């Protein structure tokens, strides 16, 4: 919990700095690539979390891996190394993306399906979901085979569960009463 609060604070500060320098979108792209790299590369994640690796080694390695990032992002790296908080970099990247989207009026619609959505289906869902909100919508597809079929749509605090697993659960409750 504390690292999440710290990540939010760092993300807000970086967003403010990036906005003042006019590079918020470039930093957002950096944060997306950082979050994606840490999430998909277990070696990188383990390297960042490893307490036996010195701060200097981590800093030089990560500046080499993310050599093409914006100066504000490099400044964040340096600040995290100084404060010995580099283990929360992935959380900061995720929080920055959320704050950036929020400040630009973008809302994320999380669609959970049993199998990955193809581009055509994603376009149909996006068109339908766009009518439900006055904000710009982006789709995030989460694959969860346990829902068996159908989908679960979550936009902000609203959720619509049209999954087969949910229907079976409702049927089970009705039959047991």
UniProtKB/Swiss-Prot annotation:
Q: Show the Gene3D superfamilies listed in the entry.
A: N-terminal domain of the delta subunit of the F1F0-ATP synthase
SUPFAM superfamilies from the UniProt entry: N-terminal domain of the delta subunit of the F1F0-ATP synthase
Q: Name one Pfam family in it.
A: OSCP
**Entry keyword Chaperone:** no
TM segments? Answer: none
Query: How is this protein situated with respect to the membrane?
Result: Peripheral membrane protein
- Establish whether keyword Cell membrane is in the entry: yes
Where does the protein end up? Cell inner membrane
Single GO term (MF): proton-transporting ATP synthase activity, rotational mechanism
Q: What's in the keyword line of the UniProt record?
A: ATP synthesis, Cell inner membrane, Cell membrane, CF(1), Hydrogen ion transport, Ion transport, Membrane, Transport
Query: Belongs to which family?
Result: Belongs to the ATPase delta chain family.
Cross-referenced NCBIfam families = ATP_synt_delta
Q: What does this protein do?
A: F(1)F(0) ATP synthase produces ATP from ADP in the presence of a proton or sodium gradient. F-type ATPases consist of two structural domains, F(1) containing the extramembraneous catalytic core and F(0) containing the membrane proton channel, linked together by a central stalk and a peripheral stalk. During catalysis, ATP synthesis in the catalytic domain of F(1) is coupled via a rotary mechanism of the central stalk subunits to proton translocation. This protein is part of the stalk that links CF(0) to CF(1). It either transmits conformational changes from CF(0) to CF(1) or is implicated in proton conduction.
Protein name according to UniProt: ATP synthase subunit delta
